[in-house]
Design a protein with these regions (language model features):
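Glycine-rich beta-strand-to-loop/alpha-helix junction loops that act as flexible
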Residues: 74-75, 105-107, 258-259
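Short glycine/serine/threonine-rich phosphate/pyrophosphate-binding segments
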Residues: 109-116, 137, 264-265
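A glycine/threonine-rich phosphate-anchoring loop and its flanking beta-alpha core
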Residues: 9, 116-211
Length: 379
């Protein structure tokens, strides 16, 4: 079992635990008299498996632990306050008290809604996650950020509150789709660009490229399961280290936003375009992050942060070999509004994270218009 401890505050702590199967987490749930399971309908099989295990233990031990469950459709359009209120209404209807545990099983949308609802219901309910996508295992479920979208803007409303547990389960890699894998791989590469301990960036590019070039990509993911788990744990470890030193994102934690200012603007523009045209050209968060990092790499060279004139091209070539997009489908000017409303904007300046080299990033405060002008000229 791999265990990482993140100190949350003087009263609580948050643990990341790697367990073999989803039923192995039951031993960590013994102290909770009631468990409320919120799960993505697409991973119903995992939720059912866990609930059945808890009920089996109840039957053999005579325990009276009760389990209630609530299925949600985990789509970006559902990542809003209405969904959070639905969960709170369900908890209230079931008379959930503050001794209970809210357990979210699913990807980043599910963990965000779980954490947000638990943060505000009765001023705080204990909660835990079973992230079922690579992206949520290495990023979304770690660190205590719980956010939902508002007026199409990404994660505009939210809380910072740590889950008591994050259970990382390799079993979920057996059923992960290739698109989800690609989305998660972008967040892993982002993490290793920030901190390239043990040359994990190069290792990740090699494994992801082999999977992408395979004729049967889904089978290839399973074939490289051992290597992927090592990379997942490494990425989770890096993020946990950073969060433990800067819970409220006052300094070092901002590094984890590499590519995200551009990514959130691209996601916002994609959502807006779909609403205007009735289209369904959805860009996943990981795909947008890959594009955002590529733009950040170009910008880093243009303003002299990165002295290596080949770095941006090398990163983009690496990303393409891993099956990731590197070019934005939208004109830079169309991203201005979303970037100005980004959470990282203060006094008209955005905290951009730029790349000095693989393993070293820096923060630079820049005006949105200046950045977009540079990007436009570089096209």
């Amino acid at each position: 079992m791999n265990k990482i401890k993140i100190l949350s505050d003087r009263k609580t702590s948050s643990h990341i635990l790697s367990v073999e199967t989803i039923t192995d987490i039951v031993q960590y749930l013994e102290s909770y008299p009631r468990i409320f399971v919120l799960y993505d309908i697409s991973v119903k099989g995992y939720a059912d498996k866990l609930i059945h295990k808890i009920n089996d233990i109840n039957g053999t031990t005579g325990n009276q632990k009760t389990v209630d469950s609530f299925a949600m459709i985990a789509e970006e359009e559902k990542k809003n306050m209405q969904s959070v209120m639905q969960v709170c209404s369900w908890l209230l209807e079931k008379n959930a008290d503050r001794n209970a545990l809210l357990l979210g099983i699913g990807g980043g949308i599910t963990t965000d809604i779980t954490g947000f609802a638990a943060s505000i219901y009765k001023r705080g309910l204990r909660f835990a996650f079973v992230p079922t996508t690579i992206l949520s295992q290495v990023d979304a479920a770690i660190g205590g950020k719980n956010g939902v979208n508002f007026m199409n803007y990404k994660n505009m409303l939210g809380t910072i509150r740590m889950p008591e547990f994050v259970f990382e389960c390799p079993e979920v890699l057996e059923t992960i789709s290739y698109r989800d894998f690609v989305s998660g791989s972008a967040e892993m590469l982002k993490t290793f660009i920030i901190d390239n301990r043990d040359y994990n960036y190069e290792k990740a590019v090699r494994i992801f490229s082999l999977i992408h070039s395979s004729k049967d990509k889904d089978s290839s993911i399973k074939s490289y399961k051992k290597e992927l788990l090592t990379l997942i744990h490494a990425a989770a470890d890096i993020k946990a280290d950073i969060v433990s030193r800067d819970k409220y994102e006052k300094g070092e934690r901002r590094k984890l936003n590499l590519g995200h200012t551009f990514a959130h603007a691209i996601e916002w523009q994609a959502s807006l375009t779909n609403k205007q045209t009735g289209g369904s050209n959805n860009i996943s968060h990981g795909e947008a992050v890959a594009i955002g990092i590529s733009i950040a790499a170009d910008l880093s060279q243009q303003i002299g942060i990165c002295k290596d004139k080949e770095l941006a091209r090398n990163i983009q070539n690496d990303f393409v070999s891993c099956g990731l997009a590197t070019a934005s489908p939208f004109q830079p000017a169309s991203l201005a509004d979303a970037m100005k409303k980004d959470k990282k904007t203060e006094d008209g300046m955005v905290h951009f994270i730029l790349i000095e080299s693989i393993g070293k990033v820096v923060e630079k405060n820049l005006e949105v218009e200046k950045v977009l002008n540079i990007i436009e000229k570089d096209k």
